[in-house]
Amino acid sequence: MIVNVAGAGAGKTTKMADIIMAHDIPDGKVVFCIAFTNAAADNIKEKVAEKVNGVPDNIKISTIHSFLYKELIEPYYYFLYGKHFGQLSTSSLPPSNCYRSKKLFELEQEGSLHITKIPEKAKWVVYQKSKDTKEVKSVRKKVLSYFNSYCSAIYVDEAQDISKDIYDVLSALERAGVEIILYGDPKQDVKGFGYFRQIIDKSSDVHYFSDCYRCPQIHLNLSNTLAQKDEKQVANCENAVGSLEIVFESDIDDVKEYIETENYGLCYISQKRGEFYTHSSETIDECFETLRHEVFRAMQEKWREETTEIEIERAAYFVAEKMLENYDQTGNLSLIHI
């Protein structure tokens, strides 16, 4: 994999758009450019379109989930596992693992694939699934060979969001001959997957971009204290000089007046109030979601032909809420009046 590491404000999207446009795409092949959000994908499309008055047909730009589903699962999953998914589901899932698994199983029985399972299913297509038969492995080789025959390269934006399943997918495609080019910033791995950092450490083809077109150097001096040596950033000479100070609320009589008087260009205030939990889930929320799921299944079985799934979801939410309110007041979970 070719790895490009660039921090915030380094112009990653613009750089990637330039390199994509310069990519020598053979006749009959396409280049895929994938991002992790719709906004990021739209931004890349805009950058590419600006350079050539529209996105060429041999450059496919989409979100990662759209790519995995449309390019891997939809055309090939049936040939390996004899199952076709007719639609995608974005319905909420219960927090309880038991009920979550039940919900996912029910969706698949109905021919629906939940969006959270897309990376795993795509991994089964190109990488492996436990207990694969020889026949499945043989078909997978043909799938990879065919995909490589028309895919010239895959560019990945915001690569710090790569999860284990997506890493396995990209690794399998690379072994099949597809060129993989990553752009990202491990310092922005807010989801904590850690796979982009592992890729950087293992790769022999890593490029660092230190320029920052967004922040004053004085701000970067602070952030650089937390960055690895190769990932420290330098402000562009045209950036504003800027200033940096930290003010505690206890030292200020009137926060609103202080901010308005000082006339800051940007000001970020972090304020939270309430009860906070350090354990993984809140019992009340889990009870509600479990109850809502059961109510939804019962309603769906009765009214699936008469109304939409979203309307049933709304009704289940309302009924579950009323049932818990009734339980708090009477100790009885049954719903007497709505």
What are these model-predicted stretches?
Residues M1-I336:
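The feature marks helicase ATPase cores and/or their adjacent C-terminal helical subdomains
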